[in-house]
Amino acid sequence: METGNMKYFLSEKERKASHSTCYHEFFKGRWDENAMVYWDSESLNIHDDLMIALGLDRLIQGIVEEYNPYGETEINACQWKRICAEAEKLGGSLFEAVSELSPWAEENFRQNSVFTILGI
């Protein structure tokens, strides 16, 4: 996915160029802990500082009780719709960030029942 016009999320290529691993990876589908694949080329990444500053972590935690910012958390389509609706209510940069991620999430849900957030 091309991320050149993205304000909040980075492609894996952009994340790698930053020389940082302090990112939350949004991984398409169900993550396979046995394969231990991190920083997938189809993933989008958001820096931990930005995730916190936007309140995206709190938004997700409010909808997905098992959300773990340091581990793996699966998000299904119903949860994603609730995240989008709540972000729209809250507005501002949080809504912008969720809106930026939406095309990627919608593409994911055409082929997968979940996407996985891999925490820092």
Language model features with spans:
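Acidic (Asp/Glu-rich) sequence patches and key acidic residues
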Residues: M1-V114, I120
